[in-house]
């Protein structure tokens, strides 16, 4: 049987990928990156390639190990943050950030806002601490057509307080001057940026009978 060989851009591994939570071809066995991490890495390379990041200050919420290493070597100042994680620089609530206005050039918070009760307050705070022309990358898992707000955190969904829909990113227009959206279909398929789903699973970002794409919003103050 022919093997599916992929390339992980985060660690340069080349070979088969592991299943993760029932999703085939999901996890790199070397650095443990998932589909979204490999997709995000390629978009980060694209949007940062013409930036002098050695002069930029960055804030990274809920830092992913592979991306943490990438950011740490790139930015002049790099701060990791989370409300509960112990191995970060500072424990803070994204709804009430302790930083002065216009502190950071770059903010990265992936799969964070679906956990935040007042995501509008969080978006306000992110914009507040961004410098003029600052950039924020704020992807969430799009799982339905229209966003559903839960009355309380759902323990079966890692305590998500909402199911983000195709309309979710419309909220960003109230806080940022512009947003660019990137799709899994725009990057090298060899990194395997798609999520494999069952044939009977309805998803608004399905691209064929077994794959769904992801979307990354890159927001500018």
Predicted regions and their residues:
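A mid-sequence, solvent-exposed acidic-amphipathic segment
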Residues: 93-96, 111, 116-117, 126
């Amino acid at each position: 049987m022919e093997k599916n060989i992929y390339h992980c851009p985060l660690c340069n591994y080349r070979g088969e990928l592991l299943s993760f939570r029932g999703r085939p071809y999901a996890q790199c066995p070397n650095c443990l990156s998932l589909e979204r991490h490999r997709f995000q890495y390629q978009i980060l390379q694209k949007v940062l390639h013409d930036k002098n990041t050695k002069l930029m200050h960055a804030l990274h919420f809920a830092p992913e190990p592979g991306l943490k290493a990438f950011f740490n070597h790139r930015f002049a100042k790099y701060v990791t943050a989370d409300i509960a994680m112990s191995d970060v620089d500072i424990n803070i609530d994204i709804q009430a950030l302790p930083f002065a206005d216009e502190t950071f050039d770059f903010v990265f918070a992936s799969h964070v806002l679906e956990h935040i009760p007042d995501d509008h307050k969080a978006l306000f705070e992110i914009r507040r601490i961004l410098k003029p022309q600052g950039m924020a990358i704020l992807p969430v898992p799009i799982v339905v057509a229209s966003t559903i707000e839960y009355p309380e955190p759902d323990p079966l969904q890692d305590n998500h307080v909402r199911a983000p829909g195709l309309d979710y990113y419309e909220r960003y227009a109230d806080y940022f001057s512009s947003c660019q959206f990137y799709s899994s279909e725009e990057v090298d398929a060899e990194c395997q940026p798609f999520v494999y789903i069952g044939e009977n699973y309805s998803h608004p970002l399905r691209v064929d009978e077994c794959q769904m794409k992801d979307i990354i919003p890159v927001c500018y103050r």
